[in-house]
Amino acid sequence: MATKKGGGSTKNGRDSVSKRLGVKVYGGQQAIAGNIIVRQRGTEYKPGKNVGIGRDHTLYALVDGIVTFEHVTKERQQISVYPKV
């Protein structure tokens, strides 16, 4: 008879690496041209003035300025960057 039980197998123990999504520069903060503002899956936020969109729906600043989050509709928000005057 064995003194130790055989090591059984398990179906658990795996997890995916986090994708680090979310807002990187918040409203009222300063952004430099090229700065990533939001990393997202799909277009939760739409690009507004002076904001570009990457092929993975990442929003980034096209000019230096202040980031603003604006409501287009009740549910839909767009992000714009306005240059400092």
UniProtKB/Swiss-Prot annotation:
Q: Which Pfam families match?
A: Ribosomal_L27 (PF01016)
Q: Which GO terms describe its cellular component?
A: ribonucleoprotein complex; ribosome
The biological processes this protein is annotated with in GO are: translation
Could you confirm whether the keyword Membrane appears in this record? Answer: no
Q: Which InterPro entries match?
A: Ribosomal_bL27, Ribosomal_bL27_CS
Q: Which family does it belong to?
A: Belongs to the bacterial ribosomal protein bL27 family.
* Protein name as catalogued: Large ribosomal subunit protein bL27
Origin organism of this chain? Leptospira biflexa serovar Patoc (strain Patoc 1 / ATCC 23582 / Paris)
Recall the taxonomic lineage recorded for the source organism.
Answer: Bacteria, Pseudomonadati, Spirochaetota, Spirochaetia, Leptospirales
Gene that this polypeptide is encoded by: rpmA
